[in-house]
Amino acid sequence: MNEYVDKIKKLMEKEMVRYVIAGGMTTAVNLVSFFVLRLVTDLSRSAANIIAIMLAILFAYFANGFYVFRSEQRKSVGRIIREFISFVGMRLFAMVVEVVGTNLLCDSFRYNEFISKIIIQVVVLVINYIFSKCFVFKKDKKPVKDILADNYIMIISFIIPAIFMFVLWVVAEIGPFGGHSLTMVDSLHQYLPFFSDYHDKLVNEGSLFYTWDIGMGSNLLDIIAYYMACPLNFIIVLFSREHLYIAMCLLISIKIALSGMTMASYLGYKCRNKNNLLIIPFAVAYALSNYVIGYSWNLMWMDCILILPLIMQGFEQMMEDGSNYRLYTLSLFYGLLCNYYICFMICVFLVLQFILTNHKNIYKGAEDTLRFAGTSVMAAAMSAFLLIPAYIGLNTTASATRHFPKWEWYGSIWDMIKQMFVLTEPIKSQQFDGGVNLYCGTFAILLIGIYIFNTKIKWYEKLKNVILIVFLMMSFNNTLLNYIWHGFHDQYGIPNRFSFLFIFILLSMGYEAIANTDKKQIPGIALGIIVAFGFLVYADKNIDMDRTVIILTWVLFAVYSAGILVLGLVRGKGRFAVAAILSVLCLTEIVFSAAKGYESNGTVNIPDYYGDAASVQAAIDSVKTGHFPYRTELNNTKVVDESTYYNMQGVSLFGSTVSNDLVNAMHGLGFYTGANEFLFDGANPVSSSVLGIRYLFRRQDEHMSYDMDYVDTVDGVDVYQNSRALKLGFMVNNELKDWTSDASNMFDSINNFVEKSTGVAGTFSQIYPEVTGSSNDITITHDNPYSEYFGLSDILSL
């Protein structure tokens, strides 16, 4: 008997065994609480899930802390609080996985909710063990003050952009400070409505695979993969629909601040000194570059901007130490997961980096090749659950039909270089494909020459980076290279979306140059300064720039040059003081330019677009009776995808994932179409009825564009009904398979559609009214074969 007791005691000494026991008990608390809440109360699945998980978290903290990992028995109050906050924080991530996973299995895969809850526990158990073991109850964990002291440069690099964004919110009256928003251009017309539909699915436990609220019914997984896959986006469930724009602005601001932190991490690794004060201005310059200011309204792109420094840090670690591949794999996985489009550009950049890396010998090169390929494939495989559906969906879009452009130049290369100078207005959208956002600080330009002449930096590193910036500059100005960088896709009004790669290299070169300054480098510094001033003189002759920009650049060059020379001459506290002064000067330039950039960009006043949202929603709700098998639309939208914002089963879709075949079909039915859109504009009685559009909502100050029957007015919004609207599904003749939408005349196309569907011909007929008149010996008669009028026959004959 004692022998069995001893075996049990010995077994219980194993941490994994104790974790399984505690995990089983925690799971029991979770499951029992969930089942009881669902059976006894009227709580929704997600609400019951969250309450059950919170109860399980409280139980798990004590079970893990005092039984499984057996952390110190006597702890200070501060240690307990820190440990508890850390534990809960990590478990909240697992809670998101559990809630979303349970809903996904229930609503998308149609599993029973209790079975779904049990299945997802396996995933949660693994996540919780890793977090608890590696982060929360780590035995050699440093005190908080030591962690802050070791990483204060990274923390400051986060705080400065965060403070800047907070001040911007206040001054520009963003969100709660006045209703303005950073969600401009497509972010207003596409992303906000898509986030509204995503919000509706998360809150109301809808399917994440398909939605009826976008473009007559769309593959929601495609849309999530392109626009909303970032895990941070789950915070939208904490906001109401009318405040989703605030959530999006918050996400943009958080990602900008995180970009500064990740860049600081990379630069600290680059020169093996993460506490160098000079890291801060370069990290902040990355976070507040013109690219970020101009394009941050593409909040899904910002995930790749913030993760790029960590991808490169992991890549360089892996090339130096083949055993260290985790950071590269996980960060690349994050980039591919959050936005495969921008991450494609990062992948091209990584291939160029790998090709230009010094692999020392053929054996090391072979090992590096296998390691680079293997870890990259691993990252892609981890995100394949989104990448594969996204790829299949992309092959149905207009961009799938690739037509390679000729090798041509957009313009002078000096027009590109001009965008590197201070006070350059950031581009937020532009029809000219040669525009580019390159500004990231005047000091970055000055340090190019100093970098090249620095003898402490390896020559092949210099050659690699110079080749990359020259190639990227060529790509900005070349139609074919530009097309390839953009994923074999045209730019559509947002030019050179990969210019953040140029900014990243430029800033990393600049920091490496300034971090390696000493007395021995003074001749190289002086030569680099001479080259920089020579470049400025030559640029002044070739670029049409405002004199204020030229004068300010001269002044900044002079000030920075003096500071860098002094930095190379002094040591100890004197060097720290000079570095502090230089950092403040550089930060002043960056922050001032960022403020001017946001002033130039402006903001969107949300009430101008959604000020009557409550009234429109009331009108929509007045005709809703559960799940209804018909569609509704807005007479005249203020936002392109406005029907999606209201979770209407509408027609319109403006987005990058739109099907090319559907665009062509909608064009044939008379609707307005573009390369990546089809809208309700252009609807006629036949097309409206065929698509099952039963109700139309019109704001009273708008012209009524369609022939429908007035029903009611709800809170200032008129409701119209189309009594001839068909169901969403109906039978047609087999001949419809032969219908093509390429007729030059939409009436001919519609006639052909109806005839092939029903056998009824002549839905629309040509009318040639007699037009005659005379005045001053001039006689007017209708004799123009190109002037055609079409009349609609009785649609009931359908």
Regions found by a protein language model. Give the residues of each.
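Start-transfer (signal-anchor) and selected internal transmembrane alpha helices
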Residues: 1-3, 8, 142-174, 371, ...
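Membrane-interface junctions at the ends of membrane-embedded or membrane-associated helices
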Residues: 142-148, 270-272, 316-326, 355-370, ...
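Membrane-interface coil-to-helix junctions
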Residues: 161-263, 284-305, 394-398, 407-432, ...
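Periplasmic/ER-lumenal interhelical loops and adjacent helix-loop junctions
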Residues: 185, 190, 196-200, 231, ...
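Membrane-interface micro-motifs in multi-pass membrane enzymes
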Residues: 221-226, 246-258, 278, 285-309, ...
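Soluble catalytic regions of membrane-associated enzymes that act on cell-envelope
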Residues: 238, 547, 577-798
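Membrane-embedded helix bundles of polyisoprenyl
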Residues: 253-270, 275-360, 371-396, 532-537
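Contiguous transmembrane helix-bundle modules in multi-pass membrane proteins
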Residues: 342, 463-480, 489-615
